[in-house]
Curated annotation (Swiss-Prot):
InterPro entries: HAD-like_hydrolase_sf, HAD-like_sf, HAD-SF_hydro_IA, HAD-SF_hydro_IIIA, HAD_2, HAD_sf, PGP-like_dom2, PGPase_prok. This is Phosphoglycolate phosphatase. It catalyses: 2-phosphoglycolate + H2O = glycolate + phosphate. Specifically catalyzes the dephosphorylation of 2-phosphoglycolate. Is involved in the dissimilation of the intracellular 2-phosphoglycolate formed during the DNA repair of 3'-phosphoglycolate ends, a major class of DNA lesions induced by oxidative stress. The lineage of its organism: Bacteria, Pseudomonadati, Pseudomonadota, Gammaproteobacteria, Vibrionales. GO terms for molecular function: metal ion binding; phosphoglycolate phosphatase activity. One of its GO terms (cellular component) is cytosol. It holds the Pfam family HAD_2.
Length: 228
């Protein structure tokens, strides 16, 4: 990959563009308590997110990153349904964009890059969140965690984007905050841009060996915008 080649930039959402944990934590706490289990704190949920809502709820019920195998499918399904309801009720009022996100997306959009969103978040929640924070119009494609049979780190969503837009792996960049984002990029054969903030279970993003590591999304501009 060279900077001149990049045509499409795929972004993760939670932990990359949006700090959504405050709302997720409220919903997870309410859901676990509703089924008779101990509640969870925001600090716990920061560790549990990143692999989709089913995994988040399994971890919350287990009070651990490792899901208790004795939890029944019925219980997990009930808690997940409650979680979805409670999360919808939060109105996403506690979530907020990270610094420089809106400005960076605007500049990339104006520069002519194709921008896509590839998140493990359930699809039904994504449009409202993007609209609420004023960034929906920047994305040509919005792919949720249930858009395909597999979630990141499976590359199926990234492969779909490359096929749709008729581009090569060298022409796409994946931007994210977790090893699932970096592994998805590696599995798709494209470069990755890893952010040091966000949700990565306490593991430095550099450990996943992304092609670029940054503390701010604004640093992405230095990677993809090449002066004439």
């Amino acid at each position: 990959m060279t900077q001149q080649e990049i045509k499409l930039i795929a972004f993760d959402l939670d932990g990359t563009l949006l700090d959504s944990v405050p709302d997720l934590a409220v919903a997870a706490d309410q859901a676990t308590r509703a089924v008779g289990f101990p509640g969870v704190t925001e600090l716990q949920v920061r560790d549990y997110v990143g692999n989709g809502a089913d995994i988040l709820i399994g971890r919350a019920l287990s009070q651990s990153l490792t899901i208790n195998p004795e939890l029944s499918d019925e219980l997990r399904a009930q808690a997940r349904e409650l979680f979805d309801d409670f999360y919808q009720q939060t109105g996403h009022k506690l979530s907020h964009l990270y610094p420089t996100v809106k400005e960076t997306l605007k500049e990339l959009h104006q520069a002519g890059f194709t921008l896509a969103l590839v998140t493990n978040k359930p699809s039904k929640f994504v449009p409202d969140v993007l609209q609420q924070h004023g960034i929906a119009d920047y994305f040509v494609d919005v792919l949720g965690g249930d858009s395909f049979p597999e979630k990141k780190p499976n590359p199926i969503a990234l492969n779909w984007l490359m096929e749709k837009h008729q581009i090569q792996p060298t022409e796409m960049l994946m931007v994210g905050d977790s090893k699932n984002d970096i592994l998805a990029a590696k599995n798709a054969g494209c470069a990755s841009f890893g952010l040091t903030y966000g949700y990565n279970h306490g593991e430095p993003i550099a450990a996943s060996e992304p092609d670029f590591v940054a503390d701010s999304l604004a640093q992405l501009l230095d990677v993809v915008l090449v002066s004439a």
